[in-house]
C-alpha cells in the first residue's frame, strides 16, 4: 500500500553559527494582493462536472461553515463548467441557467457572501467551454463587466476550443478586461501548462495550472475514451514539471489542480495527496461532495498544521531532497527559518526510515536557503499526529 509515512516540522531552538540572513523573502508583483497565500476553497467539477444547481452550492457553503472548514481557511466556492445556458442572450450576454439557478446568480452570490465566503465562476478562452457552453472568445470585456456586476471574487479561465489563439495574448486580454471592469477578481489561468504559463503568467493572473486534469489515484494515467487526452494521478502531476518552483510565490502560484481527497483513494493516499499539495504551496481547492464527507476526509482537509505549511507567508514551493528504493524525502523552507520534511513512500511495501541528521545539509539553491543539522538543533513535530518527537540530536529510525 502506498502511503505517507510522516511529515515533520523542524523548529530551530538552539543556534550555533547559524544565520537567518540567508532567508530571502520573495518579492512578487501584485494584482491587488488578492492571493498572497495559495487560495483555498471548493470547486464543483471533480465530483459533479456539469450536474450543478443552486441547492448544491448553498448546501456546500453551509457545510463549509458548519464543519469548521471556513474557519480553517477555505474561502472560495467556485462553480465550474455548466452554470450558464447553452446560448447567450440577444445582446451577447452570458445567461445563468434558469433551471439550475432559478433564484438567479446574483442572489446566489449574495448568499455566499452572507456566509463570509467568496464566490467564483468558470469560463474559457475559446469559442466554447470544455463542456460546450458559450466561451469568452470575442466577449472578454463584456463578460468581465458581467462578472463585476455579479460581484464575484474568482474566475477560473480554461483553455478548450482555442484553435489559432495565442495563449499569452488570450490570458492577457482577459486579465486586462477584468481590471478594466473595476472589480478585483482572483484570476486562475487554467491553461494546462502547454504554453509554459509560469514564464509569462506572473503579471497576468494569480495562479496557473501546470498540467492537465487530476484523477483520483496515487500515480496513474487515466486515458479518456473520447479525445486524445489523459488525466493524471497526483504524483504524476508533481513529477510532470521540472524546475518551475522558482516561478511560484505570493500572488502567483503554480496550481497543481484541485484536490481529490475524499474521492475514492485510500485514507493513506488522501493524506499523501494533501501533504504534497501543502508542501508544493499549491492552491487547496477541495473537489469532493461535502454532503457525503467522512470524518476522516474532514480531518485531512482541516489539518491545521499542514494548512499552515501551505499558507506560510514565504510562499516557497517544496522540492525533492532525495529518493532511494521508493522512499522519497521532500523539504520546504518556511518564513521563520524552520523547515518541513516529508518522508513519502512511493512503493507498495512498508519502508523503514533512518535519517542521520548530522550527515545532512539541505540546500535550497533556488532561494539560497540552508538547513545545517550539524550547527543547528531543531525540535521535531509530527504534523499528522501533532506530537513532539524529540530533536535532531538523535537520528530518526522507525
Locate predicted features.
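Bacterial Sec-dependent N-terminal signal peptides
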Residues: 1-21
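N-terminal module-boundary/linker segments of secreted carbohydrate-active enzymes
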Residues: 21-58, 63, 185, 344
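Structural recognition of the beta-strand scaffold that forms the well-ordered cores
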Residues: 38-44, 73-79, 118-123, 153-158, ...
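Aromatic-lined carbohydrate-binding/catalytic grooves of carbohydrate-active enzymes
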Residues: 60, 64-164
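Glycan-recognition surfaces
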Residues: 186-289
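Catalytic cores of secreted or luminal carbohydrate-active enzymes
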Residues: 271-322
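Carbohydrate-binding surface patches
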Residues: 277-280, 285-287, 323-369
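Intrinsically disordered, low-complexity Pro/Gly/Ser/Thr-rich segments with frequent PxxP/GP/PP motifs
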Residues: 385-398
Amino acid at each position: 500500500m502506498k502511503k505517507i509515512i510522516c511529515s515533520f516540522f523542524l523548529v530551530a531552538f538552539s543556534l550555533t553559527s547559524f544565520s537567518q540572513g540567508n532567508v530571502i523573502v520573495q518579492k512578487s508583483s501584485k494584482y491587488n494582493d488578492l492571493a498572497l497565500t495559495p487560495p483555498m476553497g471548493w470547486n464543483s467539477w471533480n465530483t459533479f462536472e456539469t450536474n450543478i444547481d443552486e441547492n448544491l452550492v448553498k448546501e456546500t457553503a453551509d457545510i463549509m461553515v458548519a464543519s469548521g472548514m471556513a474557519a480553517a481557511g477555505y474561502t472560495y466556492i467556485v462553480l465550474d463548467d455548466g452554470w450558464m445556458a447553452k446560448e447567450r442572450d440577444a445582446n451577447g450576454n452570458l445567461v445563468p441557467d434558469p433551471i439550475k439557478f432559478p433564484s438567479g446568480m446574483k442572489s446566489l452570490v449574495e448568499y455566499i457572501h452572507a456566509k463570509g465566503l467568496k464566490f467564483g465562476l468558470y469560463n474559457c478562452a475559446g469559442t466554447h467551454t470544455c463542456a460546450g457552453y458559450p466561451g469568452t472568445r470575442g466577449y472578454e470585456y463584456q463578460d468581465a463587466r458581467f462578472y463585476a456586476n455579479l460581484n464575484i471574487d474568482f474566475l477560473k479561465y480554461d483553455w478548450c476550443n482555442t484553435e489559432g489563439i495565442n495563449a499569452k495574448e488570450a490570458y492577457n486580454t482577459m486579465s486586462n478586461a477584468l481590471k478594466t471592469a473595476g472589480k478585483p477578481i482572483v484570476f486562475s489561468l487554467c491553461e494546462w501548462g502547454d504554453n509554459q504559463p509560469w514564464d509569462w503568467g506572473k503579471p497576468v493572473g494569480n495562479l496557473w495550472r501546470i498540467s492537465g486534469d487530476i484523477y483520483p489515484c496515487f500515480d496513474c494515467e487515466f486515458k479518456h475514451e473520447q479525445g486524445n487526452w489523459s488525466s493524471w494521478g497526483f504524483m504524476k502531476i508533481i513529477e510532470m514539471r521540472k524546475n518551475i518552483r522558482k516561478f511560484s510565490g505570493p500572488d502567483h502560484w503554480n496550481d497543481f489542480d484541485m484536490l481529490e481527497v475524499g474521492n475514492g483513494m485510500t485514507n493513506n493516499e488522501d493524506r499523501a495527496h494533501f501533504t504534497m499539495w501543502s508542501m508544493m504551496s499549491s492552491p487547496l481547492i477541495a473537489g469532493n461532495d461535502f454532503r457525503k464527507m467522512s470524518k476522516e476526509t474532514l480531518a485531512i482537509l482541516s489539518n491545521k498544521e499542514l494548512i499552515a505549511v501551505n499558507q506560510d507567508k514565504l510562499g516557497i514551493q517544496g522540492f525533492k531532497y532525495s529518493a532511494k528504493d521508493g522512499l522519497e524525502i521532500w523539504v520546504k523552507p518556511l518564513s521563520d527559518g524552520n523547515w518541513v520534511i516529508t518522508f513519502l513512500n512511493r512503493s507498495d511495501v512498508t519502508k523503514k526510515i533512518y535519517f542521520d541528521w548530522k550527515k545532512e545539509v539541505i540546500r535550497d539553491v533556488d532561494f539560497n536557503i540552508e538547513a545545517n543539522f550539524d550547527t543547528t538543533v531543531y525540535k521535531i513535530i509530527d504534523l499528522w499526529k501533532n506530537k513532539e518527537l524529540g530533536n535532531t540530536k538523535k537520528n530518526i529510525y522507525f
